[in-house]
Amino acid sequence: MNQKLLHTANPFADPGDGTGAYNVYKVMYDAVAEGLTEEDYSTTDWEGCKGMINNGQIACMVLGSWAVPQMKEAGDNADDIAYMPFPITLTSGKQAASVGPDYSFGINASTTEDNQAAALCFVKFMTEESGFSYDCGGLPVAIKDTRLPDFYAAFKGIDFVVDEPAIEGEEDL
């Protein structure tokens, strides 16, 4: 999708079948039009909203999995916090969820070999042993790690779709 969007004549047009970018944005548009969102969503108090969703003052938020642990820790109702795929279906009839990386680790190619070796040990520890991705609500990073946080239960049968890298020469479009 991310490689085709730039080359689509009208990428946000309604395809008429309940799929595509138009219908993702239509869900959000309808929620605002029907008064189901806060009056000024551009000035949301991030810290305050975590407690508000935890105690039931906010019903739903469109966020990534990284936010789930924060919402659970923001009050006494952690069991009330859940995570679900965005309710849109592909033309294939399947439901999918877009996945992508959070922060990335890098090793400075200009530093000493000793520093590079130490950095590699740190990256291996973070990705293979620390549980960082799991604890933050992410998908496994290491090939051997198949654990998913419990809140991914709603994703059973959902295809995870990873964005393709930008086409060479179009990285900054």
Can you say where each PLM-predicted feature lies in the sequence?
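Acidic/polar loop patches that form or flank catalytic/metal-binding clefts of enzymes
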Residues: E34-Y41, M61, D79-Y83, F132-C136
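Periplasmic solute-binding protein
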Residues: M1-T8, Y25, Y29, K94-A109
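C-terminal lobe and pocket-closing loops
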Residues: A67-N77, L90-L173
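A structural supersecondary motif
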Residues: I81-T91
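Short helix-initiation/N-cap motifs at beta->coil->alpha
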Residues: D40-N54
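Alpha-to-beta junction loops
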Residues: N54-L63
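Glycine-centered hinge/linker elements that transmit conformational signals in sensory
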Residues: H7-S42
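Solvent-exposed, polar/charged alpha-helical surfaces in well-ordered, non-transmembrane soluble domains
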Residues: Y22, K26, D30, G51, ...
